């Protein structure tokens, strides 16, 4: 209970403490940017009505940049789509297998001379959680 009174006393003291008026007043600089001519102890309201500030240069327009986003939607760039003519295809799948949730990633590269495939799978949630399984295989046609 005594700790509560001490904490309450600190809060009351900090709320009642008076800060001197000029203690937190920042120094303002003229609008032309010269730091050597400081306007000492001027309030923002006084600076607004200053005649020197009326001739401020115009503010430049912000520059906008457009970033093309990658997307998995059909027709998006940089991703092989199902049924496309690219020799490489990558598919992923997350599915529920009883009480377990399994993730699978398949990658295949097919040409007229060889086929290469890789598979990675892991049970990510459930009682059958384990280390990932992976396999890599390939065939070469003579």
Swiss-Prot record:
Biased composition (Polar residues): 85-96
Pfam families in the record: Coleoptericin
Keyword Secreted included in the entry's annotation: yes
Localization annotation: Secreted
InterPro entries named in the record: Coleoptericin
GO terms under cellular component: extracellular region
Residue ranges annotated as propeptide in the record: 17-70
Keywords attached to this entry: Antibiotic, Antimicrobial, Cleavage on pair of basic residues, Immunity, Innate immunity, Secreted, Signal
Gene Ontology BP annotations: defense response to bacterium; innate immune response
Tissue expression: Strongly expressed in the fat body and the Malpighian tubules, and weakly expressed in hemocytes and midgut.
Sequence segments annotated as region (Disordered): 72-96
Signal peptide: 1-16
Primary location class: secreted
Similarity field: Belongs to the coleoptericin family.
Function text: Has strong antibacterial activity against E.coli, Streptococcus pyogenes, Staphylococcus aureus but not against Pseudomonas aeruginosa.
Name the UniProt record assigns to this protein: Rhinocerosin
Species for this entry: Oryctes rhinoceros (Coconut rhinoceros beetle)
């Amino acid at each position: 209970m005594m700790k509560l009174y001490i904490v309450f006393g600190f809060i009351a003291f900090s709320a009642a403490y008076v800060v001197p008026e000029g203690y937190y007043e920042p120094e303002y600089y003229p609008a032309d940017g010269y730091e050597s001519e400081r306007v000492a102890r001027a309030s923002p309201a006084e600076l607004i009505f200053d005649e020197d500030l009326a001739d401020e240069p115009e503010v430049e327009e912000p520059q906008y940049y457009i970033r093309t986003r990658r997307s998995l939607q059909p027709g998006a760039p940089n991703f092989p789509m199902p049924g496309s003519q690219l020799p490489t295809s990558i598919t992923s799948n997350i599915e529920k297998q009883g009480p377990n949730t399994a993730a699978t990633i398949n990658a295949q590269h097919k040409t007229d001379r060889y086929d290469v495939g890789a598979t990675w799978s892991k049970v990510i949630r459930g009682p059958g959680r384990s280390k990932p399984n992976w396999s890599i295989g390939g065939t070469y046609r003579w």
